[in-house]
Design a protein with these regions (language model features):
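Residue-level signature of catalytic and energy-coupling elements of molecular machines
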Residues: 40, 54, 92, 107, ...
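Amphipathic, well-ordered alpha-helical segments in soluble domains
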Residues: 50, 57, 106, 168-171
Length: 248
């Protein structure tokens, strides 16, 4: 089912963008709408890229907020540390179940593996090694979910610049074609071509700037989240290793 969502999303964005471009005079006012429509069909493509970009931005915001879990992530990590300092591994697992999110999933995977190995009375080295492996495996599964669609944002920013440049070139071609056909300077035809060029340039730059800014914002959030998660995982592993030594 999921494999059909992306093509359907692109198709829906295409239909919406073409509709908005075609009815732009009725939607945005006669003067501005007519200018946008006369700038050519590449404006519809820029609108489609903007719609896709906004969709990816909303999806990333919701996903990253969900990845942090139900409560404050720093408070959750501090509470897990307190539980482990008191050798309350079951309590730490319960906190992970209540918090949810990517960090909680990683912590829970390591803690549950630790509990299982302790019940089996496995050697300390095996307990530490397999607990670390469980944390790394869970982290490897969660990280791609945090970074999903970031490449799409970057790609849209790059493509929109090229589309805007293409529209600029086409507008200038129209201007020079008008000069060559009439043999004299026709101000109205010249203005139409220049207007098309500038509108496409502005549209492409707007979509590109928005995409670059949001891409960097999300990359920074993901990097900070991964750093906090790695730091907490390392500390949890050290506490579990110390607890395994104390119980020997």
């Amino acid at each position: 089912m999921n494999r059909f969502l992306v093509p359907l999303g692109f198709f829906a964005a295409l239909i919406i963008s073409v509709t908005l471009w075609w009815f732009m005079p009725e939607i945005a006012g006669e003067e501005f709408g007519h200018q946008m429509k006369s700038a050519g069909p590449l404006v519809a493509m820029l609108i489609m890229l903007l719609i896709l970009q906004i969709s990816f931005v909303i999806e990333r915001m919701l996903s990253l907020n969900k990845a942090q879990g139900r409560g404050s992530l720093p408070d959750f990590l501090n509470n897990v540390r307190k539980k482990l300092h008191n050798n309350d591994v079951d309590g730490a697992i319960q906190l992970c179940g209540q918090q949810r999110g990517s960090a909680a999933n990683v912590m829970r995977a390591g803690l549950e593996r630790y509990n299982l190995l302790k019940k089996e009375q496995a050697p300390k080295d095996k307990v530490v090694a397999e607990t670390q492996a469980a944390i790394q495996e869970a982290s490897g599964l969660e990280t791609p979910l945090l970074e999903r669609n970031l490449i799409a944002l970057s790609t849209i920013a790059s493509i929109s610049t090229m589309v805007g440049l293409l529209g600029t070139v086409m507008g200038m071609i129209r201007s020079f074609a008008a000069l060559g056909t009439s043999g004299a300077v026709d101000a109205s035809k010249l203005a139409v071509g220049i207007s098309e060029a500038l509108i496409n340039t502005a549209g492409g730059l707007f979509v590109a700037i928005l995409g670059i800014v949001m891409y960097n914002v999300f990359v920074t959030r993901v990097d900070n989240f991964n750093y906090m998660m790695d730091e907490a995982s390392y500390e949890v592993l050290q506490l579990l290793a110390a607890s395994a030594s104390d119980k020997r």
